[in-house]
Swiss-Prot record:
Pfam families: DUF4547. Residues 5-40 form a coiled coil. The chain crosses the membrane at residues 59-81. Its main location: membrane. This is Single-pass membrane and coiled-coil domain-containing protein 1. GO terms for cellular component: membrane. Keywords: Coiled coil, Membrane, Transmembrane, Transmembrane helix. InterPro entries: DUF4547.
Length: 214
């Protein structure tokens, strides 16, 4: 074997070792890219979770700090509770087979997180009312904070005390998410009242409550 042949073989072996190392490095880089992407996704998810929690905390703080008088609070509470009842009632209308297992709106909210069909129906109901999840979250927060002392006022009583509830909410509720949710509740109920005849518009709240079977 000549010196040139030996040198050529050694060079080929060296190139093969370099090629193997490059392939190994390429595999490692791909694994690092996957790890980086996973970490990025986890970071983004964590950031969104923190942002969502911060936004929810702000709504809670705003709901607790509302400067409404007792009468004003009851009027706003009346719109909120009527919208929540409407959402629950509509869900039961669309899911008659689940009436017994969905006795409250809270049960609907829990079930939709686990059941795709319930979630899709819930999304369609929100679309019907022109609501988004953040609106419902704001309304539920308001209800939790003030539900223990809130009193429902009928529509004619509300009009007698305050002519423009939306104006009052806009002026007094500074948190944008809470303000948007409350304003949307007023719009939904007022639009519904306009669509009803005078006799139906005087229906008491209990007639709006969905039937619940034992």
């Amino acid at each position: 074997m000549t010196h040139e042949t030996t040198t050529l073989i050694s060079l080929k072996e060296a190139m093969k070792r370099v090629d193997n190392k490059l392939r190994a490095l390429d595999t490692q880089f791909k694994e690092l890219d996957v790890t980086k992407d996973n970490l990025t996704l986890r970071f983004e998810h964590h950031s969104k979770t923190l942002a969502s929690q911060a936004a929810q905390d702000e709504i809670w703080t705003a709901a607790l700090a509302l400067g409404f008088t007792s009468m004003e609070l009851n009027i706003v509470y009346s719109y909120v509770i009527e919208v929540l009842i409407c959402l629950h009632t509509r869900m039961l209308q669309k899911l008659p087979d689940l009436v017994r297992s969905l006795p409250t709106l809270a049960s609907v909210l829990r079930r939709k997180a686990k059941n795709k069909h319930v979630r899709l129906v819930w999304e369609s109901v929100l679309q019907e009312y022109g609501l988004q999840e953040r609106d419902v979250s704001a309304l539920c927060t308001f209800f939790i904070v003030h539900g223990n002392k809130g009193e429902h006022y009928a529509a004619n009583v509300r009009r007698m005390y305050i002519k423009d509830v939306s104006f009052m909410i806009t002026n007094m509720v500074k948190n944008q998410a809470l303000q948007d949710g409350l304003l949307r509740a007023v719009q939904i109920i007022e639009k519904g009242k306009q669509a009803q005849d005078p006799e139906n518009s005087r229906a008491p709240l209990k007639e709006l409550m969905p039937p619940v079977k034992d």
